[in-house]
């Protein structure tokens, strides 16, 4: 795992240097909110070390597909997202797997378990997180044949957590998204262990210039 991290870090540094060297004024970056909050400050510092004369324009992603679309249209130079195999025309740098957690009310009967079976989501009121998480989450549910009752909501992550806290349903979020949150709810890793793959993407050929 350490070797994989070091290799990913080396590839990240190399790609940042290559993208930075090919831009004359602005490097355009799109990222999920959780990645922007926890990772982008250090990554932007790397860009500035490579090219202090180039500005970094950061845009928050409001859905899984939008960063890929912006990248394909040439409106973004770099995106930090979850891996979507059906998308094409980009080079992918894996950074880490982001573990999925069940988000449950405090009074949920977990009976001392250290993991939450995915099967227990079946038929339950489910509050879908923000940022188009549905693709990553539904891929996991479909893999095990689970069909929760997805509530018609379009709210941000803190609101999802608050709704769960007040007993309005359950949810599933990742470790990175939940960092520093969740005091009013139970956070239990799902079983079987599931994760979304997070990384950096550039247009095909961009990382080799």
Model-predicted regions and their roles:
Residues 1-18:
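Alpha-helical "hinge/linker" immediately C-terminal to small N-terminal DNA-binding modules
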Residues 20-21, 87-126:
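Flexible hinge/capping segments at coil-to-helix
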Residues 24-88, 154:
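Central regulatory/effector-binding core of bacterial HTH transcription factors
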Residues 39, 135, 186-209:
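A late-sequence structural motif
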Residues 54, 71-80, 100, 146, ...:
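Alpha-to-beta junction loops
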Residues 82, 110, 124-144, 209:
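Secondary-structure junction motif
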Residues 82-89, 139, 143, 157-185:
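A ligand-binding cleft/hinge motif common to bilobed small-molecule-binding domains
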Residues 91-101, 152, 171-176, 183-197:
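Short beta-strand->loop
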């Amino acid at each position: 795992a350490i070797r994989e991290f070091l290799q990913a870090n080396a590839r990240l540094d190399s790609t940042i240097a290559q993208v930075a060297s090919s831009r004359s004024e602005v490097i355009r970056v799109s990222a999920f909110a959780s990645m922007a909050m926890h990772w982008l400050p250090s990554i932007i510092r790397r860009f500035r070390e490579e090219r202090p004369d180039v500005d970094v324009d950061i845009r928050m992603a409001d859905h899984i597909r939008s960063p890929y679309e912006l990248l394909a249209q040439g409106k973004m130079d770099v995106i930090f997202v979850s891996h979507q195999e059906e998308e094409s025309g980009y080079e992918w740098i894996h950074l880490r797997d982001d573990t999925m957690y069940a988000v449950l009310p405090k009074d949920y009967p977990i009976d001392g378990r250290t993991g939450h079976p995915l099967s227990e989501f079946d038929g339950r009121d489910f509050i879908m997180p923000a940022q188009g998480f549905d693709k990553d989450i539904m891929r996991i549910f479909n893999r095990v044949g689970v069909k929760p009752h997805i509530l018609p909501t379009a709210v941000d992550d803190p609101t999802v957590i608050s709704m769960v806290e007040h007993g309005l349903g359950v949810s599933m979020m990742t470790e990175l998204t939940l960092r520093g949150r969740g005091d009013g709810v139970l956070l239990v890793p799902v079983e079987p262990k599931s994760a979304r793959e997070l990384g950096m993407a550039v247009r095909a050929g961009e990382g080799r210039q």
